[in-house]
Curated annotation (Swiss-Prot):
Domain of life: Eukaryota
Phylogenetic placement of the source organism: Eukaryota, Metazoa, Chordata, Craniata, Vertebrata
Compositional bias ranges of the Basic residues kind: 288-299, 336-345
Family as reported in the entry's similarity comment: Belongs to the eukaryotic RPA43 RNA polymerase subunit family.
A GO biological process held by the record: DNA-templated transcription initiation
Protein's name in the database: DNA-directed RNA polymerase I subunit RPA43
Matches recorded under PANTHER family: DNA-DIRECTED RNA POLYMERASE I SUBUNIT RPA43, DNA-DIRECTED RNA POLYMERASE II, III
Record gene name: polr1f
Organism: Danio rerio (Zebrafish)
Keyword Phosphoprotein attached: yes
Length: 391
């Protein structure tokens, strides 16, 4: 197993990881597909180690490999295929994302076969360039996409990162911030994540100093724009162009003619307005007189009707008063007659009960009448006596 000689007809081993897409184009069964992203070579990755804000680390790592039986005669090719499939994918054992590898060594002379499995198990050791960003670390990327809320960047040509828009900037300011596609951008990492396939997701934000610079730039632009508008307004008001003398004369003539026409028009308008006022005043006075006459007629009619109503009311009141007085008089006379009848009846009874007589025993009507008259009231009227005589 430690023999690295290749048999006749066997493919040559891959020395550059960038050639993986050409050599292992999915011919190996059971192996994962190779990513389409551009993978840097080991030499290029080593050069990037010295770059600022690269977050790349060179580390020698030992790991376990299980080769299928198809790679018994081409062991190195099988190892390279497995390692190439793990590039640019997050690895827990490496605590990062492997970018490139080199210097593969087999630990031990022989491999092992466990039980009835067909895979050959052995350990290898290699040098890996690992991408290990942390929260708070800074990265340099190249802008490849401009959005309303973020900017897409490509770090080391193979890692996607999205830089979010600062809250201090509006969408218009973010659009006019001067960022464009192809420009390098420095940002700070604040979130790292990996999906089920192991693809690393990076979220970043601009540095505070850069945000302050952008805000200051926009404020300065706004101030300059306001000052320029004010200056333009003052120039328009103060620095008016001086016309020529000929134009002035023409303008003066036109002004005098227009003023004369205006005076004539104003005088005609005044005359027409005065005439209209006089006519309107006459019409108003005539209408007022006619209305006053109508009002007088209405007043006279109302006065006559009211006087007639008063007379009628007075007559009715007098009639009712007379009726009431007559009824009262009749009632009083009847009451008096009743009283007189009662008195007469009493007198007649007393005359019948107590007859007067002489010493000789003769009874005369005169004495009884006199006594009756003396005993009666003095209030009797002579009319009553006449009535008795008539009876």
């Amino acid at each position: 197993m430690a023999n690295w000689t290749q048999e006749d007809g066997a493919p040559t081993p891959v020395t550059n990881p960038s050639e993986v897409s050409q050599v292992s184009g999915g011919s190996v069964t059971g192996g994962p597909a190779v990513t389409s992203c551009l993978i840097p070579s080991f030499a290029e990755a080593v050069k990037l180690l010295k770059a600022r804000y690269s977050c790349l680390v060179l580390d020698t790592h030992r790991r376990h490999i299980s080769l299928p039986p198809v790679h018994l005669k081409k062991k190195k090719t099988g190892i390279q295929e497995q390692l190439n499939a793990e590039l640019l994918k997050y690895s827990n054992s490496l605590d990062g994302v492997p970018v490139a590898y080199d210097n593969i060594k087999v630990v031990g002379q022989h491999g092992n076969i466990y039980d009835d499995q067909g895979f050959i198990h052995f350990n290898i050791e290699a040098s890996f360039v690992i991408f290990r960003p942390k929260n708070g670390s800074r990265l340099m990327g190249v802008i490849n996409k401009m959005g309303a809320s973020h900017v897409g960047c490509l770090v080391h040509g193979c890692f996607n990162a999205s830089v979010m828009k600062p809250n201090a900037l509006t969408s218009d300011q973010w659009r006019d911030s001067g960022l464009c596609v192809g420009q390098s951008l420095e940002f700070e990492v604040f979130q790292l994540d990996a999906d089920a396939a192991g693809v690393l997701l990076i979220r970043g934000r601009l540095d505070r100093s850069r945000v302050q610079e952008l805000v200051a730039q926009f404020e300065q632009k706004q101030v300059t724009a306001e000052s320029s508008t004010e200056a333009d307004a003052t120039e328009d008001t103060t620095d008016s162009p001086k016309p020529k003398k000929k134009k002035k004369r023409k303008k003066d003539k036109n002004d005098t003619e227009s003023s004369m026409e205006e005076c004539v028009n104003n005088s005609s308008l005044q005359e027409t307005s005065e005439h209209h006022q006089t006519t309107t005043e006459e019409d108003c006075s005539a209408n007022g007189r006619h209305k006053e006459k109508k009002k007088k007629k209405k007043r006279d009619k109302n006065d006559t009707e009211s006087s007639m109503d008063e007379c009628m009311n007075n007559n009715s009141l007098q009639e009712t008063a007379l009726d009431t007085t007559e009824e009262d008089c009749n009632a009083n006379e009847r009451h008096k007659e009743k009283k007189k009848k009662k008195k007469r009846d009493k007198q007649q009874d007393s005359a019948e009960i107590v007859p007067t007589s002489d010493s000789s025993g003769y009874i005369s009507d005169k004495t009884s009448r006199k006594r009756a008259l003396e005993a009666g009231d003095d209030t009797e009227t002579p009319a009553a006596k006449k009535k008795k005589k008539s009876k």
